[in-house]
């Protein structure tokens, strides 16, 4: 048929045919309708005949005019009345397939996902109405269930489902008159996945049958921006597009942020991923307009309410604030107050009111020399504070992971100083330099004292780290030039000059010889990483190194290469300041923490690199400290801080309180003949002359206080044959604390449950790529 004969080319339709089909019986009586139908059928027969004749001649027929009563229109109406069928194999619709083509959906509200489906996670339940009440209600105002997308609810673990529900109730004001919360889960519990679930749910639905928010902002360290984008893509399979702010010119960044901020309608990229530094620079743009919700990853960066980043984020026009931090208390309660005040302003009052009502009383009761009245008041104030913050904080420990992960053995190893280290250490303590530092020391330790502390820590690691000070005859080393042996070579590492390095060398050799385990070596100093490199080259071990000088893109490749079972990398050398947070190093199952940090959170983050989802082997964590030295004093300071965190965050009233502030001030004392200064200060009742006579309580594990661990003054009873053999061979170990996690339960991991997801290599979460200076490890030191 020629195209000019097509109905669309034959002129306009009759006016009545432009509307939807209306049965003629509604307008005319039966007889007139029958007559009109017969006339239309006769006209249709004539038109069809004209079309057949026109196909053989050049003559054009009269214009074809379809009416609402034609058989053609009746057929179309029947097609449109059919049930809508999704063209997918084995597709089962949520509501019985009641949708039809061409018909406007029913105006009655219903949830986006079926609340009665198997494994459904319902975040909001509407009020239960009787049928009589429903008859008198406006169907367009009925509240509906808020149900998490089955794509996510089917892979969430029980504690993650609880976390999503808690955060939803907080941001929606269901748990008091506040809209913020702190997700304080420890590392490895899936805080990112829980936040992805929350954001996706709020962007898609709400009780009013419409999205709760139209956009959200995720603020994180710069090295985590790309990882957040990959996490959204991984869990949502590309259903949500994000706007990552990394790189790019200033003009392009301003244009993108202005477009994101000004648009109030639904965006194509409703989630902005931005670093703390970039947010601070462009805060003026982002704070002009309202935003649905803000999420702050690694939220302990906001511990100081006076810094510019904190103040910029406080200016953001949003009531829904979520802060992620596995360590909300790192140093003191003032920092904790800053975090709570960020998510829920005025919950705890002003800073002065908080200090007067809570902080002073709690800290006085924490000291061992406190009176009974002070301890009782501290308990009362602690319970009062817990009652307030419980409305907005959720905290789960790594204990949950025991059912998903292999067993973990954690050991604190006290290594003896060598004769050379001992002479350098004692000479420095007796020097005029240290005496002047102690004389000037006040509530906030002077910069000179901090430098002296760093020097002592380096002596504990290896004399090579202070070689330049020795040759330059700096203050404190005027009488130590002849301590090093005559054959000493600064660029040729000699492990025998350090007790910790000698132990490390023995253990690495045994691990390499006895199996295919891989090892992570962590230090707070890049100079120590240089010594690790020298040792690896000397023993011909394959290794990779990650510190602050490595670009973010290269980090991901390095991690993937190390985790590959086929790679020849035996060691992963890591700077805790540059990459101790978020890296997934499950290719290794042994980790050495070579030197302690003042902040226990930094050490905890670094030591969580191997015992994570995907780990298949038993894990061994070794923490090395020099016996009786300042490193043990730092370990004791960590115990004090963890006791405070345990009391406030974990609601553990029986947290041990063994160290007074006077004990913690005693940094520059040293006893060369002691097995473990920490064990002596514990005043352990289970040991007699440093020999354990009674095992720890059965309900304890490696998360318990050191006083509840196993205590070993010899190599008998150690859980690790490698350490037991090294203790006997190198004779440089004086004491060991050790414990293990609870037994593993056979439970599928999240990756195994998500069978419908494409395989993807684990993505690492990285910290800022700013190079870490050697002295940065003491930035969290506080005066006692």
Curated annotation (Swiss-Prot):
Entry EC no(s): 3.6.4.-
Modification Phosphoserine occurs at: 20
Residues modified to Phosphothreonine: 22
Keyword terms of this UniProt record: ATP-binding, Cell cycle, Cell division, DNA damage, DNA repair, DNA-binding, Helicase, Hydrolase, Meiosis, Mitosis, Nucleotide-binding, Nucleus, Phosphoprotein
EC class name: hydrolase
Subcellular location: Nucleus
Residues engaged in binding ATP: 185-192
Region ranges (Disordered): 1-36, 745-784
Reported effect, residue 191 to R: Partial ATPase and low chromatin remodeling activity
Sequence segments annotated as region (Required for chromatin remodeling, strand pairing activities and coupling of ATPase activity): 2-9
Residues in Helicase C-terminal domain copies: 503-660
UniProt subunit comment: Interacts (via N-terminus) with spn-A/Rad51.
Annotated function: Involved in mitotic DNA repair and meiotic recombination. Functions in the recombinational DNA repair pathway. Essential for interhomolog gene conversion (GC), but may have a less important role in intersister GC than spn-A/Rad51. In the presence of DNA, spn-A/Rad51 enhances the ATPase activity of okr/Rad54.
Entry protein name: DNA repair and recombination protein RAD54-like
